[in-house]
Amino acid sequence: MDDNKRKSLDAALKSLDKTFGKGTILRLGDKEVEQIDSIGTGSVGLDLALGIGGIPKGRIVEIYGPESSGKTTLTLHIIAECQKAGGVCAFIDAEHALDVKYAKNLGVNTDDLYVSQPDFGEQALEIVETIARSGAVDLIVVDSVAALTPKAEIEGDMGDQHVGLQARLMSQALRKLTGIVHKMNTTVIFINQIRIKIGATGYGTPETTTGGNALKFYASVRLDVRKIATLKQNEEPIGNRVKVKVVKNKVAPPFRQAEFDVMFGEGLSREGELIDYGVKLDIVDKSGAWFSYKDKKLGQGRENSKAFLKENPEIADEITKAIQNSMGIEGMISGSEDDEGEE
């Protein structure tokens, strides 16, 4: 760059710093590239699929899928992991359906969880903005976008047309929220439902998410959660096999997938993942129906091995660390013992 251009640019930068504050615009070469902090999801496989050890801090995240696919369960596990790392969490229960007992079973410290049950969409998003601006909350969950009903629709008569109101509400809110959450390093998770597009024909999926297109654009990470099988024991359903696809990722390569068990009343099965990934990475040995780790037999069959790991958390922790070492994600996951020790 020649001297005249440099002087003009320096004058412009000084003017911007004076008007908006120091650091308004920086040259990337002058600033060390920061590693993106993350919040663990409670799933080793999903933390790996996300590429940074969990969901990114200071970003907007969308988790969507059909009903009863495990969206809220996954989100409650993320809250539990955030709390383990010393984070403060808030749950905006627009659906008025939070099961406190189930949240406790999943490891959420409900005594320290801030919960709001707003009456209409504008109120919910105003609450999100206010607590995000405080800079004191690490994670805010909104359950769900479909339940963010505009005030005009609630106060109107049944059958009134309110075309595009919710989409405009979401677009306006997200324009404001994006900068706030980045500045305050607060993560906002929106849980969303899927709908079938009316009159959809030809190629591509007929499915779409509620609340318009704004969330698709503003979200740094979008997770598609699907139930792929029912887990049974003695012909009795005991849980679901769930697949999560990272359909959008601005902080790491997208389109990776993770699968895990979600057990009824217990949530995500960490032990099931340890066996699956342990076998895949040759950390856990499988001989016939028997599973073993080093010189210890874990059990005959997957369910018995899961039960053994649940009763022996020290062995489960050892296998977890071995998997993280093998995958190269050790120390990336918030809430790990190493992270707690550093704090």
From Swiss-Prot:
Its main location: cytoplasm. It is found in: Cytoplasm. GO terms for molecular function: ATP binding; ATP hydrolysis activity; ATP-dependent DNA damage sensor activity; damaged DNA binding; single-stranded DNA binding. One of its GO terms (cellular component) is cytosol. InterPro entries: AAA+_ATPase (IPR003593), DNA_recomb/repair_RecA (IPR013765), DNA_recomb/repair_RecA_CS (IPR020584), P-loop_NTPase (IPR027417), RecA-like_C (IPR049261), RecA-like_N (IPR049428), RecA_ATP-bd (IPR020588), RecA_C_sf (IPR023400). One of its GO terms (biological process) is DNA repair. Keywords: ATP-binding, Cytoplasm, DNA damage, DNA recombination, DNA repair, DNA-binding, Nucleotide-binding, SOS response. Gene3D superfamilies: P-loop containing nucleotide triphosphate hydrolases. It holds the Pfam family RecA. ATP binds at G65, P66, E67, S68, S69, G70, K71, T72. Can catalyze the hydrolysis of ATP in the presence of single-stranded DNA, the ATP-dependent uptake of single-stranded DNA by duplex DNA, and the ATP-dependent hybridization of homologous single-stranded DNAs. It interacts with LexA causing its activation and leading to its autocatalytic cleavage. Belongs to the RecA family. This is Protein RecA.
